[in-house]
């Protein structure tokens, strides 16, 4: 029974678009995590997520500034006022963006679709759980 639950979760969280890219939902990225004695978050990536590791994915969400001076942005499941950084959302609702080519101008809370390589961060507690490398706007 437990295996069927994971199959249903995976099916609900994954679609393929017309180009064969994996369209990932935020529900799929809602991995469990713990808090270290130092107060840092430590993600726990379930083994069924392994098929997404280092794969090209498509994800939609809101642009959230992490550091405007260095042009670091994240993609959030929620708008800025409700996201992990300013609201009460958990840390598994934001994804770090590393752009392939840095866009000239980004607008906070702009709803976008991003594609790139999904990287799992399980070793640097000062970065987000998921990183989309070679990110670019899609669609």
Model-identified regions with their sequence ranges:
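Bacterial N-terminal signal peptides
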Residues: 6-15
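OB-fold and OB-like single-stranded nucleic-acid-recognition modules
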Residues: 19-139
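Positively charged n-region of N-terminal signal peptides that target proteins for export
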Residues: 1-4
């Amino acid at each position: 029974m437990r295996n069927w639950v994971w199959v249903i979760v995976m099916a609900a969280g994954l679609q393929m678009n017309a180009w064969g890219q994996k369209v990932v939902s935020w529900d799929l990225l809602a991995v469990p995590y713990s808090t270290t004695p130092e107060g840092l978050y430590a993600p726990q990536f379930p083994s069924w997520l392994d098929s997404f590791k280092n794969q090209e994915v498509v994800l939609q969400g809101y642009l959230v500034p992490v550091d405007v001076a260095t042009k670091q942005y994240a993609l959030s499941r929620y708008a800025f006022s409700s996201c992990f950084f300013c609201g009460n959302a958990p840390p598994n609702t934001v994804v770090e963006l590393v752009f392939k080519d840095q866009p000239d101008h980004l607008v906070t809370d702009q709803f976008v679709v991003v594609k790139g390589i999904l990287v799992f961060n399980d070793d640097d507690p000062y970065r987000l759980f998921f990183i989309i490398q070679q990110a670019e706007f899609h669609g």
